[in-house]
Amino acid sequence: MTNKHTKDVALVLASGGPRGFAYIGAIEELEARGYNITSVTGCSIGSLVGGIYAAGGLQDFKEWLFQLNNYKLLGLLDISLSKSYLVKGEKVINAIKNIVPDVNIEDLRIPYRAVATDLYTGEQVVFKSGKLFEAIRSSISIPSMFRPVRMGNHTMVDGGILNTVPMDIAVRNGHDLLVTFDVNQIDSDKIAASLAAYHEAKDKYSDSKLDIKGVLEQLPAKKEKSLLEMAKWVGDETHKLILKDREAHQKVKEIDKKAEEANMPFVEDDNYYSILSRSFSLMLSTVARLQLQLFKPDILVKMNFDSYGNITAYTKSTEISDKGRALLSKALDEYEKSL
């Protein structure tokens, strides 16, 4: 039974791509406020951040991660020619292992659990022993993105397919707080309203065209004017159209910029990555919502999955970590006030 005044925390970190860098700041906030993380359970990116924390390498990992730029990120992608997946996934794992040495899960300083999905049997695979980075690599294997991991009779892909927020396998000590961080929330009503407003505003200006033909068609009505006057009139009207067209293009850019700053998903082009990523995120959001109806953590921290949804978010780890810390701090404030 949970002791409401305990400082012990069983931490559960959900699947969620680059949004999971929020867990770095969240862990730092927990420790700064005197909480004692007694176990960590993670799925996909949650298994990565949680595993590195359990191995005592979070600070070194953070320093490496926070200096990544687009160029360095590309250098970590071992692109594959396979028709089944885009990235082999070994380069990035090896780069992290150079910073945080591999270790057996049973030798970690606190209990750790990671979850993957058996692609063929549909069963959940829970890692509680064996090599840490084998567990992490299995858990992060997003279908079509990373090469599946074969271990024994298992062919493993991302654990989020079955268990996005693995609260059910968390290691508890009988009096700890279950603290869950889910980065897969979606506000459908807000997105629908924003989508309607976005297209209404964009259509208003996108219809603007440089209609020189329309100006020329008005010339017969100006036949009483001299040739010089007509030429001047055409020039003036054309100039007005050009200014109007420039204004329209600028407005469209401003609308796109505001939507991007608000992390609205419809600003992105419908490319292979964005469609795959969003489809997978929608699945994670659905699974997470159902799990949170079944399991009630003592403290739940939530982040919208549109917060950092595209591939460039992997170079925004500092910003994401700071946001995670702020969200965790707010959740702790609310919990402590309720005591």
Where do the language-model regions lie?
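Patatin-like phospholipase
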Residues: 1-43, 51-339
